Design a protein with these regions (language model features):
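Conserved beta-sheet core of the metallophosphoesterase superfamily
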Residues: 44, 71-80, 87, 94-201
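Short, solvent-exposed polar/charged micro-motifs at secondary-structure junctions
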Residues: 63-65, 92-96
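Core catalytic region of metal-dependent phosphoesterases/phosphodiesterases
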Residues: 1-81
Length: 201
């Protein structure tokens, strides 16, 4: 849901919920593509390679594909960047003993677990650590189910009118997690929105 809205209608494609949007969709999409591009450039200053996964959400499933295409075109001649295609809503990658899934999280965890263990049985069986990242509800949650550790991450975004009226709200932060190829998660950093604002001033 990086763009929050899929197109200029400003509604969720599935349910038609109204979304608060600021400005024209093209303007927002262009800015979003530039932010993602700059984030990848910054990562390249610190890492040998960057793998980009932009999971499709329920607010912007088509716009997310456009972001993927824009990044793919921009980094076409950069061998250190891989932009993973988001044809499937569940994205995954394997790295040593770590199998990692990225899914927006509209479906409940039991449904996700059933799908993952059925479709990715071989990858999960080869891995000592299985992580599933979700974001849909924005409330920090962490739960082990079967072989998988599910984690729901906070977002930086403010609640829009629909979610505020429904009394939804969560802490606003961004996190980074470091995974060891053999030992799984080894460290994490959390940055609250207030820190980001203070540093920006």
């Amino acid at each position: 849901d990086f763009l929050h809205a899929n197109d200029r209608k400003g509604q969720t494609p599935g349910s038609g919920n109204s979304l608060d949007v600021d400005g024209r969709h093209g303007k927002v999409a262009r800015r979003a593509a530039h932010i993602l591009r700059d984030a990848v450039r910054l990562m390249l200053t610190k890492h040998q390679s960057v793998q980009v996964i932009n999971a499709r959400g329920n607010h912007d499933p088509d716009a997310a594909v456009s972001m993927e295409i824009a990044l793919e075109a921009y980094f076409e001649k950069e061998p250190r960047v891989t932009v993973q295609r988001n044809d499937c809503k569940i994205q995954h990658f394997q790295w040593g003993n770590v199998c990692h899934f990225v899914y927006h999280g509209e479906k409940n965890r039991a449904h996700q677990l059933a799908h993952l263990t059925n479709r990715y049985r071989e990858q999960i069986g080869q891995s000592q650590f299985v992580y599933v990242d979700n974001g849909h509800v924005h409330h920090k949650q962490r739960e082990e189910l079967g072989p998988c550790l599910f984690e729901v991450w906070n977002a930086l975004t403010a609640s829009d009118q629909y979610h505020a009226d429904a009394l939804y709200g969560a802490s606003r932060s961004i996190s980074s997690v470091v995974y060891h190829k053999q030992f799984g998660e080894v460290s994490r950093n959390v940055c609250d929105l207030r820190i980001i604002r203070q540093e920006a001033d």
